[in-house]
A protein has these predicted regions:
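N-terminal secretory signal peptides and thylakoid transit peptides that target proteins
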Residues: 2-18
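C-terminal segment of N-terminal export signals and the immediately downstream linker at the start
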Residues: 3, 22-37
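Active-site neighborhood of divalent metal-dependent phosphoester/pyrophosphate hydrolases
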Residues: 31-172
Length: 172
């Protein structure tokens, strides 16, 4: 278990260090720019200035890598997680982002519901529904019907399809 956690931390850290807060891709033919911002570890109980910073970059896509809220809970009411999502949803900058910038999101342990949680977390399906509902995933989406929230999304970038695969390293 410890080596799995260390690998997750290492992979997440490498991704974040590679891309820092984001990066831009340019089309050499017509100098268009496409900006992607990566984010994670957004504790709703701290100052949330980072949402304004994201808006200032005017990204074309926001990829949230987990710990989008900190809502660890220990019973089926999941009140802590519900309150965490509620607090984030009340942030005007996050509201702007959610309404104006495409978001691809995956969870990590704190939006999964338990610190360092994995496949044996008894309330993982409660956390899953709250996550999908919060990020306005269409109710017909396959993630509502299958285990986990892993997914692949395609974006069109300079007339080329880019596939972004989000792995669920908690549910399984």
């Amino acid at each position: 278990m410890n080596s799995i956690i260390n690998r997750r931390v290492l992979i997440k850290s490498l991704l974040l260090s590679l891309f820092s807060s984001g990066f831009s891709l340019a089309d050499s033919n017509n100098h268009k720019k496409f900006t992607i911002i990566f984010g994670s570890c957004s504790n709703q109980n701290n100052k949330m200035d980072h949402w304004q910073t994201i808006i200032n970059y005017k990204p074309d896509l926001l990829i949230l890598l987990g710990d989008n809220v900190y809502g660890d809970f220990n019973n089926e009411s999941a009140n802590q997680l519900k309150q965490a999502y509620k607090k984030l949803s009340e942030n005007s900058n996050f509201q702007y982002i959610k309404n104006n910038i495409p978001i691809i999101s995956i969870w990590d342990d704190h939006d999964y519901g338990i610190n360092d949680g994995g496949r044996n977390w008894e309330y993982k399906n409660i956390a899953k529904k709250l996550f999908l509902d919060f990020f306005s995933v269409n109710s017909n989406d396959v993630r509502y019907k299958r285990d986990g929230i892993y997914n692949s999304d395609e974006i069109l970038l300079f007339n080329k399809k880019i596939k972004i695969v989000s792995l669920d390293t908690r549910y399984f």
